[in-house]
Amino acid sequence: MKIIHAADLHLGSKIEAKLKDISEERKAEVRNSFLRLAKYAHENDIHVVLLSGDVFDSDRPFKKDKDTFYNVIKQYPDIDFLYLRGNHDTEEKNEDVYPNLKTFSEEWRTYSYGNVDITGLELGPNNSTSFYSTLSLNPEHINIVMLHGTLSDSVGLEKIKLSNLKNKNIDYLALGDIHSFEDGEIDKRGHYAYSGCLEGRGFDETGEKGFVLLDINEDKLSYSFHPFCERIIREINVDVSSLNNIPSIIAKVEKEVSFNSKDIYRINLIGDVPFDS
């Protein structure tokens, strides 16, 4: 059994650029990322997609962003989408019922697929300190837990204290909130991972973006990061010390940077140059 873990799509987020058409093109690419994800799942016989929070960028998403999301849900009835709301889309609700859209609340809820249990909870003021003690998992099953928040050494709103989840029979903790892939160990049994976002939206979200692919074979679970972004946002420093004219600086940049025509770049010129150059 294979499962996709994604998060932080942030459909409808503001993307600014000096040229409006470029901004709109990038917004469309971010919006299209969820459709590409669902298509990938369908073509690769993956029937469960985890969405660990912040599908939308706000509690009141634009109609075109809601339509994009829910149309994909309808388009792929063979895929179960497990949608856990995050801190950006806490109030998002949909009046229509889609059998393949599975949601969560502020109490633990479990969806089972054979011996694989997927358990999730949406963090809020009423459960931010108590949810650790109320988590109960079957030790004989493969347990995937979904949460949206930031790992912390303390408990509190939108915080997840990893040490409080040790020895809870978690095999994989599917997290959202951090926009780059990050993973680590919970205890001898389980691991956690932030999938990161599907598409970088600015120069604070550089590098490869994508999702985590889980592979479950009998009683063993493995996972790997799967790059999936349409474009990579890159920020690169080029040392131009001692260069005293524009042509030589351009030549240095072209020598040191391997440009991909699809990617987005910010080149920072660093170093010491003569004052009169």
Task: Describe each model-derived feature in a short phrase.
Residues 1-67:
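N-terminal active-site segment of His-dependent metallophosphoesterases
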Residues 5, 51, 83, 145, ...:
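Structural beta-sheet core signal
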Residues 18, 22, 42, 48, ...:
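His/Asp/Glu-rich metal-coordinating catalytic cores
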Residues 21-29, 116-122, 231-248:
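Acidic/glycine-enriched edge-of-secondary-structure segments
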Residues 31, 35-42, 67-70, 132-135, ...:
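Amphipathic, non-transmembrane alpha-helical secondary structure
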Residues 52, 176, 270:
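Conserved residues at the C-terminal ends of beta-strands
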